[in-house]
Amino acid sequence: MKIILILSIFLICFLQLGQSVIDPSQNEVMSDLLFNLYGYDKSLDPCNNNYVECEYINTTSTIQTVKSLSLGAPLHQYVITQDLTPLQNLTSFEVNEKIYLTSSFFNYINKFSQLERIVTYSLNLTIPDDTIFPAIFETFTIYKPSVPLSKVIFESPIKNLYVDSPLTGYSIPTLVNVNPYLGNLQLPVTYYSGFPSNLSQAFPNLQYLAIYVNNDMNQNNYHNFSISNIGVFKNLKGLDIEFTDSDNPQEFSIHSFLSNVPIIDNLYIYGQGVTIDPSVGIIDLSYINPKTFLKIQIQQTSLLNNCKGIILKSPKKASFNSYYNTFSYECIDFSNIADFSDYYNDYEQYLPNIDNAPLLTGVDIYQSVVVGDIPESYCRINYLSLYYNQLNGTVPSCIQCLGGVKGGDIVLPNPFLNFNKTTEPYCPTFKIDENYTHLVATDGTEKLIITGTNLGWDGNDITPIIANSKLGITIPKGVGTNKSITVTFQNGEQRTFNYSYVPPFIKSYGFLELDGHKYFTINGTGFDFVDSNNITINDQQITFDNAMGGGDNDGLIIFPIDELPNFATESKFTVSALVGGQSSNEVTFYYFNSINITEEKLVLNNTGGSVDINGSFGTNNTSLVSVSINGTNCLVTSYTNSKLTITYPSNQVGDNYVLTLNVGGYAVNLVVEYIEGGETPTPSTTPSTTPSTTPSSTPTQSPDDDGSTSSTLSTSFYLITLLFLIQQFI
């Protein structure tokens, strides 16, 4: 009997060891907290609560630790007074608006060494200025603050700060110290809050800025106020300015923000109240770097109301999107715009004049009060959509060519005089020019370009380059000459076009390692991307695999290095190719086992200059060495087999350049970035970041079925079982 009893006790202990339990110190504080918030039974495992997410301390442990708290609505308003420091592994902390934090929480917040994120849906205390946030703390989201924000929030290493829905008592502190960490900032502004005019100076690395302006003049004791910025936002990519709607909106001038954002790529303005300072005359955004492709979006705003001529000019290739705004198209300079869309504009007017808009490729106007004709100039727009407006004139010939069914998809419904859904296609002006280029690339990325009149927008294997006048016909991968393709145009016309693939052209050689195997490579154009390639090296025919790469880069063909004929270092060898019946150039190369450059990236001044390049170059024969950047030759002024000095040309700022070092035909590439002249060229070590978006405005609950927690039998169950067995054997 004693043996059975001992075995039973052992079995119970063994089973208990196999179950997961929360860390005892965390269990005490969590049980008390959940009981006070939700009446949660203290005998239950806190990790099984929907508001708690736990994880095992490590892969072999049965002990769990609290990783995330998303505390939803409590039974009643509650102030957290418990000491939460036992939750040492907490990474995310979210509290409902009826749950309040105390200053003591922020006094020990630095003890949460893994804490990355806090979301509080109410803030009724000013965080102490001596608060020290954890080193890895990234995101602080505050809803409904009713107290002044502490300057420590703005001076801490937080990367993302989002503030929303302020209440009476909210204010923004004066910014004194520079904070290089903050990357994303969302900040509400009221008449009483104040606003720092040195944002760009205080946060030099800010990438996303959202300003929510409460401009409701109906509120008691509200008066006109304005906000401004001194300095340049050197790294700002996104700017969002939103105004609360009201019957009596306040008017703002935002020119100081829009005139100091040189690399912005997204501008969003919402709500009544934003205006352009009359003394400025025009918001000229053309200074913004065109490589950012700025997207301008305005919604339900008075920005362009009552303009007198042009008041907005964009950078090159920008897109302009308008929703529920009432303005004249004469307010906008279309010369730099690439895409234009306007939805629900109640201002009665004709379509925009696009004669001086050479970059415009897309026009989308929907449910707006545009009247009159569609001019012939709109036939060149690649992406055209004009339906559900009030156009009551005539359509151009390119639309007539398509008829009511296909053309109607672009411009109907509208009450035109000469066009409806039943209109038959009529296209006497359809014409294809005979003088097109008959040569195309073998990699399938190049199109056969044709020109003409009223060619339409698309068709099978057809894409518009300039709608109706210049189209590209997709040609598949292939090789050889005397090929043909038959295409059907949008108006139903069929035509056959003849073409040939470019002959092979050999540029250089190199080496490549794939899956542990080393290959000899030949670089060039006109290789076969479908089947093998016939290459002659020193009069010996060798079959290389089908080509790789292509597109913006040269093609690449490979052959196993251990099957290649043996060459002495710096010995000559000739290479030629026969692809699709077409012969390549014959080139003479010099063989080297290895050529390499030490630098991983080269950073150069955009004004041009001189730079050293280190590596192993295989020879002292300078006649075999050449250097180029994106095809432009550089002057080699000094050379040894381990170091060379070049004079390089000027270029626009950017990181899309490639330096090619060619030693006897062996080519090695190196990424090059051009920076503003005057800056010291150094390798870039700063990692790229992605602006965060505004977080959800509602608390989230952690599901209990995601594998992070497991249901456990309570200790009381085992004790009851043990007592029962003991009683049976006494």
UniProtKB/Swiss-Prot annotation:
The keyword NADP does not apply. Residues 683-694 are annotated as: 3 X 4 AA tandem repeats of P-S-T-T. GO terms for biological process: pinocytosis; sexual macrocyst formation. Pfam families: TIG. Residues 678-711 are annotated as: Disordered. Residues 504-592 form the IPT/TIG domain. The sugar chains may play important roles in cell fusion. Residues 1-20 form the signal peptide. It is found in: Cell membrane. Residues 680-711 have a biased composition (Low complexity). Glycans are attached at residues 58, 89, 124, 198, 224, 392, 420, 435, 482, 498, 523, 534, 596, 605, 614, 620-621, 630. Sequence repeats lie at residues 683-686, 687-690, 691-694. Its main location: membrane. A lipid is attached at S708 (GPI-like-anchor amidated serine). It is a lipid-anchor; GPI-anchor. GO terms for cellular component: phagocytic vesicle; plasma membrane; side of membrane. The keyword Lipoprotein applies. It comes from the Eukaryota. Residues 709-730 form a propeptide. Keywords: Cell membrane, Glycoprotein, GPI-anchor, Lipoprotein, Membrane, Repeat, Signal. gp138a expression is much higher than that of gp138b and may well be the major gene for gp138 product. Involved in the sexual cell fusion of D.discoideum. This is Cell surface glycoprotein gp138A. The lineage of its organism: Eukaryota, Amoebozoa, Evosea, Eumycetozoa, Dictyostelia. The gene is GP138A.
